[in-house]
Amino acid sequence: MSKIEDFGRPEILTLDSYVPGKPIEEVEREFGITGVIKLASNENPLGPSPAVIESLKEAAPSVFNYPDSNCFKLKKEIAPLFGLSADHFVFGNGADELIKMIGETFLNPNDEIIYGWPTFSEYIFVSKLMGAKPCA
């Protein structure tokens, strides 16, 4: 009988599982302290700005619509600011998606990827996923 590992890319087996940072409450309990500010997960200790809250309120009635994944309106607005056409821009759902997209497009097996340490884990992840060799 075949195992699922026999059907996937062999590089998948080299990937480490993501280990998220501990929640603030757990760190406070573990060390017996209060007032911890967590920066590792890009959490803002001040919360969202009032302008963001207002924007979310304004957008709330249309959240049932699937967003334009091509970001047509955004591209049209920012292209003139840079003197470029809209097709020069690519947007993604955060750095993870963009780094992965670049890696999937340009990395080949055995390419060497040089990165600084410590670094964002996605560089190592996509390098291994594509069979490239991450080098710190």
Descriptions of predicted regions:
Residues 64, 69-112, 130:
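Phosphate-binding glycine-rich loop
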Residues 42-45, 95-96, 120:
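Short glycine-rich anion-binding loops that position phosphate/pyrophosphate groups of nucleotides
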Residues 105-136:
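PLP-dependent aminotransferase-like
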Residues 2-65:
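N-terminal "arm"/small-domain region of PLP-dependent enzymes with the aminotransferase-like
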Residues 11, 35, 88, 133-135:
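Conserved beta-strand segments of alpha/beta enzyme cores
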